[in-house]
């Protein structure tokens, strides 16, 4: 099994078409026959032929894919902080409102963020569906609006067992 999603990515301020490789797997009885290698080469050739300059994947094993010629372009960072480490509420004008994950203002805020953030993917409809496909139903989206009711920022989060997990 093998899939390549067509996406765009901000690379140093320029928008590039990329191929996002996902769902790379094979049945155990077919491992060691070079099937994935053939599929990968064929997909990379097709991406090149369709003017996609970059191919991306989230590897389950960095050493394995590094040995196959892939390299890391970003890191996933996790922070654990106690509630007492968060500053007390600041007196900022504006307000926060929860919205549905398919809210257009939320999507526009992400597109604005992607346009100014190196390495960020622009999400098309398929990418938005995949973004929330495996999340728990309680995942929430909140938008901050300034004093002029303009959306200025967002947070995607889940509260589970009295712990807030911020996805982005």
Which ranges hold each PLM region?
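Conserved beta-strand in the GNAT
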Residues: 1-7, 18-20, 25, 149-159, ...
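Conserved acetyl-CoA-binding loop-helix of GNAT-fold acetyltransferases
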Residues: 23-26, 32-45
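Residue-level signal for alpha-helix termini/capping positions
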Residues: 48-49, 133
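Conserved active-site alpha-helix within GNAT-family acetyltransferase domains
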Residues: 49-53, 59-77
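Amide-forming acyltransferase catalytic core, primarily the GNAT-like/NAT-type
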Residues: 76-168
């Amino acid at each position: 099994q093998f899939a390549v999603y067509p996406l765009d990515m901000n690379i140093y301020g320029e928008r590039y078409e990329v191929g996002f490789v996902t769902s790379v797997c094979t049945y155990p009885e077919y491992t060691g026959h070079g099937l994935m290698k053939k599929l990968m080469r064929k997909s990379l050739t097709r991406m090149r032929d369709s003017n996609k300059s970059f191919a991306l994947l989230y590897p389950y094993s960095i050493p394995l894919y590094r040995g196959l010629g892939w390299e890391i372009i970003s890191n996933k960072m996790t922070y654990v902080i106690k509630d007492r480490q968060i500053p007390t509420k600041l007196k900022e004008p504006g307000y926060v409102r929860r919205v549905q994950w398919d809210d257009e203002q939320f999507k526009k805020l992400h597109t604005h963020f992607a346009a100014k953030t190196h390495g960020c993917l622009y999400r098309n409809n398929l990418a938005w569906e995949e973004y929330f496909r495996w999340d728990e139903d309680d995942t929430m989206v909140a938008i901050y609006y300034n004093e002029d009711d303009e959306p200025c920022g967002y947070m995607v989060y889940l509260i589970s067992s009295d712990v807030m997990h911020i996805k982005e």
